[in-house]
Amino acid sequence: MNKSGRYRWRTGFSVSTSKDTLAWYPALVRVEDLGTPAALVDLDVVARNTSRMGERASRLGVRLRPHVKTHKTIEAARLQVRGHFGGITVSTLAEAAFFAAGGFRDITYAVPIPPAKLPEAADLSRRLDRLSLLLDDSVVADAVEECARERGIRLSVFLKVDCGAHRAGVDPGLNDSVALAGRVGSSPHLDFRGILTHAGQSYRCRDAQEVRAVAAHERDVMVAFAGRLRRAAVRVDEISIGSTPTLAVAEDLAGVTEVRPGNYVFFDATQVAIGSCALEDIAFSVLVRVIGRYPSRRELLVDGGALALSKDPGPVHVDPGCGFGLVLTAAGEPVPGMRIISLSQEHGVVRCPHDLTAGQFPVGSLFRIVPNHSCLAAALFDRYAVLRDCDVVDEWRPVRGW
């Protein structure tokens, strides 16, 4: 990097993702020239992942409203919405404001809104064609309605439904849930969009067959609940579902109108373990250097710790010894048997499957680590080095904060 903190330019060209038309930018440094730890994004893999998931949504007959929380960048979001209607999903109001400034006009804030954030959300809604909020509580419904009434605006609202993840959402089997939907739907100050869920339990599956069953359950619960609401004279325009695992393997989404996958842009070690993708589909990794070598215990120390990889335990239900990520060479090839066995703030301990020979993996050697959870690891960096092959061709800056 130069003194400004940006990467040095060198001769070469690459395709920029900053615009829909092809533009050419000079390429940057090689991977081995980067400081570590560094967040790496493979541009061609991102483009392939976004294209495939978009095509899959179209084949299943559902509208794609991709989640942008994994990458939090304008560039990747533009790839996600290319060829689709342009709406996105966010997980923070900071993301919503950032993407609004970047030209996105239809945004769903997919976290139940607390009353304390309503003034900020209401102000932001004036800058958009639509900002949709989530709620699953009658007290919050009252607060959202009062906020809209006081400001003389209509706020768009989804009712969050629990389809088995048990993190948030109303129970679709309860009469109170129907009553809450009717309460929101009848308000002159609220625009009731419909019902929304996230099958987070899909991440606890062991293989694609189990994920496929979760996808079918997610669909069935939501379509049945929408039918119950309609019989109670509640208008339901949208049935919004989605996670990367379920959309990756779903076979039938009849009755669903919208899907909101997000992790598929990068994928990660967990997605490989549960059958959502192959290793070659992973677009995000963390570049680290060997800073210590301990042959007597077959261990290496690297300069990527919890603040570069996160401490997400990963798919321990599939592989109890998975460690904290997949270890690849600097060129992106797997290193069989290597495990990251522990992380502290700035240190990672890598266990080798065999004795270290003289000169093998010396201090200064580079590895790429595929994190267990790319959403968490990516959020730890303020910039990504965007690659084509081993050339850094761009730099993406994610939004941070809440």
Question: What residue spans do the PLM features occupy?
Answer:
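C-terminal accessory subdomain/extension
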Residues: 295-402
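A charged N-terminal "starter" segment
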Residues: 2-123, 396, 401-402
